[in-house]
């Protein structure tokens, strides 16, 4: 009887402190986004013959993603991605305001038009090239146009956050993808 009187309060106290029941597993994913926010580039100033064919976005657990499809003509290898005070329209240099706390400029050594001058990528609403409503980090994706073998995309982000850039080869399709991942937050 004495043993029961002692065990019942002891078990109740242990349960209240979380000693008996294991803590619930952390449901948040493990996000390794230590990419930094410094510029990333490969041959950034060279114009190219490759053709921009599409721009799209996606959401992931730890980052938002923008993908640029490039039809490879001569080996797509000229691009740069960096935070800038303001993005500018290709050709005219006019400032293009973006929503969000920071502007990422994506400069491509690829054209948005073919040899006959026909657009290979021409969104109906260039300032809203991709619908990113409801995304955690992305606030706006704008097509900045194409001029003299170069094209530009502006990405408005919630804040200056880490990002990474990957070029995925197209293989036999000859359609490479420039992938820009922008983290949801800095890792502490």
Set out the residue ranges of the language-model regions.
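Secretory targeting and sorting signals
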Residues: 1-27
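Short linear recognition/processing motifs and adjacent strand/loop elements at protein termini
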Residues: 26-188
């Amino acid at each position: 009887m004495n043993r029961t009187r002692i065990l019942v309060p002891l078990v109740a106290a242990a349960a209240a402190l979380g000693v008996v029941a294991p803590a619930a597993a952390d449901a948040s994913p493990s996000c390794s986004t230590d990419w930094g926010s410094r510029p990333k580039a490969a041959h950034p100033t060279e114009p190219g013959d490759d053709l921009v064919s599409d721009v799209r976005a996606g959401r992931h657990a730890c980052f938002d993603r923008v993908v640029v499809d490039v039809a490879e003509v001569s080996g797509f290898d000229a691009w740069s991605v960096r935070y800038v005070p303001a993005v500018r329209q290709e050709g005219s240099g006019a400032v293009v305001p973006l929503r969000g706390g920071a502007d990422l400029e994506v400069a491509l050594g690829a054209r948005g038009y073919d040899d006959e001058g026909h657009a290979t990528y021409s969104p109906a609403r260039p300032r809203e090239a991709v619908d990113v409503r409801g995304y955690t980090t992305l606030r706006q994706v704008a097509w900045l146009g194409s001029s003299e073998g170069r094209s530009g995309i502006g990405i408005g982000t919630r804040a200056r956050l880490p990002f990474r850039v990957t070029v995925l080869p197209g293989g036999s399709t000859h359609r490479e993808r420039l992938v820009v991942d922008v983290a949801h937050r800095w890792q502490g």
